[in-house]
């Protein structure tokens, strides 16, 4: 056991599962904020791979300021058109020259972004429905120094910041996550009428769970208002079934609640994303590192996507804290609710946080002191293995939104 500063104490609150009101949100992969997160992270991995291939190690960069400016569209039954394209600007810092070698950073970034859009928002036509641009400046000199060289075994923190994570997920969290992933997975495969811009909001009040879904419907697959209404009802029934796989509580599902059938005002799109019709996007405005927005729990405001995976605390500590929480809950019996907070200090090795704080709600028959040594050992071991987070991120084994 090392001398890392690890604090473990009982949480002075009820477990989130036992609180009267719980709110959970997830923005789907086609939401404008998620599009920015996805592009930023895809570009990040592409740049990491470029640097590894060309110079043998990851150089200083960040792409976590990527922005989306919404377009304008005229959706219509059986197919409308985009009249003003979506504009996506990949923004950040990157090392473009190393030891006299010029590196194709901008072209790598644009290529990665276009590939991501083709794979995840297939109804978008590149060049006409969406334009991808890039502005990557040089990095700050002092931060490049903190970033260090390839022979540094444990990188130094690039910032004084923190990351948070929790486990296990509540029933409401599981439902919200599963609903979006199922709609944007198997359901969309069989029902192309639903676009990837899906937002799911869950509200639990005591033992009643309300799920509200906003789903962008693709106009070319909708013949008329009756056809649209049938598609919405199919989604509602599917979501209800998914929710009941995760809870025995009462569940109510509503889909596209702003629709007004009397006036014909419905959530119809050309491409399956609200980005085509006035909804802008930014990195870090959507899901946290575990894929959820959870106002009942502490959250970091850091944008995880697009940050450098070597020493950027806003990425590493948010992913690591979640990994620690999940590892502890998986290996230690009797934990009902666990919150992990990791705080860095700029220039300090990332495996030695300023503090690693664990707040725990145990089952009623479990004494925290009895399980504390096991919890401490897991936290210490995961911190010692912090550099594995970098490899897992580059290999696309960890999601950031």
UniProtKB/Swiss-Prot annotation:
Binding-site residues for ATP, renumbered to this chain: 137-142
InterPro entries named among the record's database cross-references: AdoMet_synthase_2_family, AdoMet_synthase_3, S-AdoMet_synthetase_arc
Gene Ontology MF: a single term: methionine adenosyltransferase activity
Names of required cofactors: Mg(2+)
Keyword terms: ATP-binding, Magnesium, Nucleotide-binding, One-carbon metabolism, Transferase
Biological process annotations from GO: one-carbon metabolic process; S-adenosylmethionine biosynthetic process
Uppermost EC category: transferase
EC number: 2.5.1.6
Catalyzed reactions per annotation: L-methionine + ATP + H2O = S-adenosyl-L-methionine + phosphate + diphosphate
Family annotation (PANTHER family): S-ADENOSYLMETHIONINE SYNTHASE (PTHR36697:SF1)
Similarity comment: Belongs to the AdoMet synthase 2 family.
Name of this chain's protein: S-adenosylmethionine synthase
Organism, as annotated: Haloquadratum walsbyi (strain DSM 16790 / HBSQ001)
